[in-house]
Amino acid sequence: MSFLPVTRGEALKRGWDELDIVFVTGDAYVDHPAFGVPLLARWLEFHGFRVGIIPQPDWRSCEPFMALGRPRLFFAVSSGAMDSMVAHYTPARKLRHDDAYTPGNRHGARPNRATIVYTSRLKEAYRDVPVVIGGIEASLRRFAHYDYWEDKVRRSLLLDAKADLLVHGMGERPILELARRVRTGEPFQAIADIRGTAVVLGRGAAPPAGVVELPPFEEVAADRHRYAEAFRLLSREQNPHCAHPLVQRHGDRTLLCNPPAYPLEEAELDSVYALPFQRAPHPSHGEPIPAYEQIRASVTTHRGCFGGCSFCAITHHQGKVIQSRSERSVLAEVERMAAMAWFRGSVSDVGGPTANMYGVHCGNTRGGHACRRESCLYPSPCRYLAVGGERGAALLRAVRGVRGVRNVAVSSGIRYDLMERQPAYFRELVAHHVGGLLKVAPEHMVARVTDLMRKPGKESFDRFLERFRRESARLGKKQYIIPYLMSGHPGCTLDDMVELALFLKRAGLRVEQVQDFTPTPGTLSTCMYHTGLDPFAGAPVHVPRGDREKRLQKALLLWHLPTERRNVLDALRACGRESVARELLGGAAGGGGGRSGSGFRPGRT
């Protein structure tokens, strides 16, 4: 099986003189299941549709968008694996100089607001062909939303792009149903009821019964309290089994967002990952693609995440229901990968959004179908959560046993609070899959901040460190924790960052990289950033907005770097904590210092 066509010549080699669906994407074409557009294109091909891909077209004219001709059914547009504004700009709104999804890691292969620009060019080229938008950019901007880069509330992307339909969440079910219905002759503009899609109703059209109406665009754009109310309402409608359709008026137009698509069953997910991917970039891409190099030896075991972290949009995109592949499916993919010429024995990752959620499910099916919690872990783990861990541990053992596999890493991150209830997975992980360094993401240690983040607190982290230390010592392994920490999150003050810096110093930990909070579309944290409110409690939240405060917060986590000493002293003066300067900036603490960039040493917690 060959790559899907990117030119008319390649389509003709398949005997296709006309395509049914043409995808346009802001990423390079990598025929691998970790890349969304190729996955959906292969899925449609499997179901009998003729599909092509136009990767990273030059948007300065409409000609590159005509490379595969006029599709019979519709165009499908995605900005790529990332929101195009997130891909282009740093948290300080400075232009990035690289792009991991582009050959040669070059910046500039896609435009800002790629979904809008691509749709505009397609309408210029083929005005009468429907355009469907999807992917992370469209999904998380489907309602009126705060845009950090313009510092204002923008309309639904469906209206701004002037597209015909928006797919939100994982797209296999909605795009297949749409394609089948259009193929049978149903008028595109009459289709407004597919789960996992949003449409703009015709002027005067009545929304379906049972909808939840969000505050209109004009109100959320002008009133932060109405914005917070809209976020609170839509957050309750993420469970596909009990969600209502949502409507939001934009002037005289009405956005109708249908409930999320139902999760794929295990057999369906297995069939997706059994599709004939080449597991390589299209030959037209002559230079290495960093994102592919990073994931080419990885295996996705499941989708979804029920952690519900405030700054993460997975719940609003993939959903909180864990959709796990069968062990047989995962092993078959590892075997195919191990047979490839480039494979050298190392599987770089076996996981998903959160590695140790594989096989975890709700033990109360009836209650789970009516549940409106965004997080199954915060403020405390749900009593119905069937966490097990044995299935995940057994899968790791089986992957290690595949012929040709010498090393297996788990690099997609873990929830250490969940792993307290997964002894089998914990033992398997520490014994065979750490490789000396284990990445975890406590993000902060001050309770007020971790509560707003919906993360476990310091006590949970301390328990995990002690457990990790004991198990590593028992195994005779020198292994370290790499904690990922965040500055500038809503609710976090300079005083909170001083406490976090002191914790790091006393623990003998030094970090070299800090994630500065970026308000990305669709998250609870972004709602708090824009409104200065907790939308669920209604309480005011401190928001670090100015460049100075953000710079000083970040500097406190890098207290050990000589280049940050002046910023650290400025931060201590700004919050009246000069008294801790000697402890923070003086000699080593924590009994022997810290290993730069490596995290905690077992035995020195």
UniProtKB/Swiss-Prot annotation:
Pfam families recorded: DUF3362 (PF11842), Radical_SAM (PF04055), Radical_SAM_N (PF08497)
Region of interest (Disordered), ranges: 586-605
Recorded GO MF terms: 4 iron, 4 sulfur cluster binding; catalytic activity; iron ion binding
Alphabetically ordered keywords of this record: 4Fe-4S, Iron, Iron-sulfur, Metal-binding, S-adenosyl-L-methionine
Top-level taxon: Bacteria
Keyword Nuclease attached: no
Cofactor: [4Fe-4S] cluster
Cofactor note: Binds 1 [4Fe-4S] cluster. The cluster is coordinated with 3 cysteines and an exchangeable S-adenosyl-L-methionine.
Binding site for [4Fe-4S] cluster: C305, C309, C312
Compositionally biased spans, kind Gly residues: 587-597
InterPro entries with a match to the protein in the record: Elp3/MiaA/NifB-like_rSAM, Methylthiotransferase_CS, rSAM, rSAM_horseshoe, UPF0313, UPF0313_C, UPF0313_N
Domain Radical SAM core, residue spans: 291-561
HAMAP family per record: UPF0313 (MF_01251)
Protein family according to the UniProt entry: Belongs to the UPF0313 family.
NCBIfam families with a match to the protein in the record: SAM_YgiQ
PANTHER family: UPF0313 PROTEIN YGIQ
Protein's UniProt name: UPF0313 protein GSU2873
The organism of origin for this protein: Geobacter sulfurreducens (strain ATCC 51573 / DSM 12127 / PCA)
Source taxonomy: Bacteria, Pseudomonadati, Thermodesulfobacteriota, Desulfuromonadia, Geobacterales
